[in-house]
Amino acid sequence: MKSNFHDYSNLVLEYGDGFNSDHNFSIFVSNLPYSKSRFAVEWLLQKKFSRAVIMVQKEFSEKLSSNEKHKAISVLANYGFRIKFLMNVKKSNFFPIPKVDSTVILLEKKKVISKVLISTVNRVFSYRRKTLQNILKQFGLNSTSKKRLDELSGDEIIKIAQKIIRS
């Protein structure tokens, strides 16, 4: 494949596990292993780049954009990226035919997110059925709020995680 792009000195194509590479990049393109999609999105959230085009399982792409019934990954992804759906890819377009459909999405970087913030948001979501008062108590903080995570916006959840980190 490199021989097809030898005229492009600013293009570096890497074949292999890019997650173990320490190269800087401005654009990331990948047909991700579906079992690594969440890991890949969290990894990309920590990197400085302009945009990524990735193919993921359709169900996962729906989780990323979900504003109802928040998931930790949707809160993080929407905080760090502008997400655009480019196209659906039917399972019948592959051989052998997989069990699921796919979606190609564009992730435009809004901000780099620290590993600590990602970890804290994930920990907060491990208490998702508790009230905010009880969640914050787990981290040694006080609150009188009886709201649950599902009642908060993604930005409010990020602010709670940032408050936990600062404490």
Question: Model-predicted segments: where are they?
Answer:
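Catalytic cores of RNA-modifying enzymes
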Residues: 1-123, 162
